[in-house]
């Protein structure tokens, strides 16, 4: 069977080596004679797995000791709610920077749940010569007392990425669902980081939360216990039964990434992949991208065909060439190629070759 390259934005492809290992030990994990899906989450074998997973993630991201690492339910949308409930209190105030669909969704959830708390927002994307560009505000010039400022460094729908680390006088809360471990960041700059697993970590259903000690002292709203960061810390992410199989696969992905040389190594590969695909788009008037070069996402490359009537043919022929899940999000249309850590260079090279051939055939 020839390789199929899956460009889905999430759930995304997992590393082949991880999938093969999971297949091999699916029915007999750690010599126990049962699947990892069947063992107790409080058994010594699974506890050892969780401790190794946290240690590996801390090593990969250089997470300081004054941060807690949580493995939680609910994905990114669950964290939209959890952030508000854990940090705002009844009289708090927060700022949301809006750069695309996902930061807009986080803002909408905050406004829904805030009650007497105040939610402010700033749109940080503007048009420059017809292209979307991020313009970060000088937050130090804003006269306000915010509990936190929230932003999303990578917008999967819009194909926008913010590479400059935010400079803020208030704690930064960041949705890294689609960019976590794709490039190096300074974790110590953040009050809280959260990420749904289904792009660069593992299967859907799991979310990672990295929270600084002092954030847990902020007043909280009345909230559900299952999304209470303080309870999650107290119970080592096991206040209730966690998504154990997703946790297991995340642990295997961390080990795989370490074997490649860590985040610094995969970041170089990710940069190569994105440059290869954007070069193809820029070199051919048959394709167009709507984002300024400085904010083009490395993880989610969005593009349109000059002749939209060929969209269906493009997707059909791409699938026949074993290049799947290239349809853009329903909100923006066009095409989207997601190049998460598990996507090999060979997959992007195959896509570029196909795009050149398709353009030549239909020009």
From Swiss-Prot:
Subcellular location: Cytoplasm
Keywords: Amino-acid biosynthesis, Aminotransferase, Cytoplasm, Pyridoxal phosphate, Pyridoxine biosynthesis, Serine biosynthesis, Transferase
EC number: 2.6.1.52
UniProt cross-references to SUPFAM superfamilies, sorted A to Z: PLP-dependent transferases
GO biological process: L-serine biosynthetic process; pyridoxine biosynthetic process
Gene Ontology CC: one annotated term: cytoplasm
Reaction equation(s) it catalyzes: O-phospho-L-serine + 2-oxoglutarate = 3-phosphooxypyruvate + L-glutamate; 4-(phosphooxy)-L-threonine + 2-oxoglutarate = (R)-3-hydroxy-2-oxo-4-phosphooxybutanoate + L-glutamate
Family: Belongs to the class-V pyridoxal-phosphate-dependent aminotransferase family. SerC subfamily.
Protein name stated in the entry: Phosphoserine aminotransferase
Organism field: Shewanella sp. (strain MR-7)
Gene: serC
């Amino acid at each position: 069977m020839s390789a199929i390259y899956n460009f889905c934005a999430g759930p995304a492809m997992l590393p082949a080596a991880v999938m093969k290992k999971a297949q091999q030990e699916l029915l007999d994990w750690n010599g126990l004679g049962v699947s990892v899906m069947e063992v107790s989450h409080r058994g010594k074998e699974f506890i050892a797995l969780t401790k190794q997973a946290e240690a590996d993630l801390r090593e990969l991201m250089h997470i300081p000791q004054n941060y807690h690492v949580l493995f939680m339910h609910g994905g990114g949308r669950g964290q939209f709610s959890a952030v508000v409930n854990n940090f705002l209190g009844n009289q708090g105030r927060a700022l949301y920077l809006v750069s695309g669909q996902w930061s807009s969704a986080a803002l909408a959830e905050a406004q829904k749940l805030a009650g007497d708390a105040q939610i402010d927002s700033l749109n940080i994307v503007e048009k420059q010569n017809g292209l979307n560009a991020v313009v970060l505000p000088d937050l130090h010039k804003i006269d306000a007392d915010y509990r936190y400022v929230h932003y999303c460094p990578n917008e999967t729908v819009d194909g926008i990425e913010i590479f400059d680390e935010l400079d803020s006088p208030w704690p930064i809360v960041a949705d890294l669902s689609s960019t976590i471990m794709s490039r190096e960041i300074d974790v110590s700059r953040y009050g809280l980081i959260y990420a749904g697993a289904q792009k660069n970590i593992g299967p859907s259903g799991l979310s990672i939360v990295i929270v600084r000690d002092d954030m847990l002292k902020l007043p909280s709203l009345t909230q559900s216990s299952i999304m209470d960061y303080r309870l999650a810390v107290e119970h080592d992410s096991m206040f209730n039964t966690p998504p154990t199989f997703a946790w297991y696969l995340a642990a295997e992905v961390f080990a795989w990434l370490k074997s490649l040389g860590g985040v610094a190594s995969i970041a170089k590969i990710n940069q190569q992949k994105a440059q290869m695909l954007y070069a193809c788009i820029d070199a051919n008037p048959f394709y167009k991208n709507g984002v300024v070069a400085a904010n083009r996402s490395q993880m989610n490359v969005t593009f349109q065909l000059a002749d939209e009537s060929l969209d269906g043919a493009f997707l059909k022929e791409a699938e026949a060439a074993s290049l799947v899940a290239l349809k853009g999000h329903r909100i923006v249309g066009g095409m989207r190629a997601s190049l998460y850590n598990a996507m090999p260079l060979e997959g992007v090279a195959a896509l570029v070759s196909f795009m050149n051939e398709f353009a030549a055939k239909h020009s």
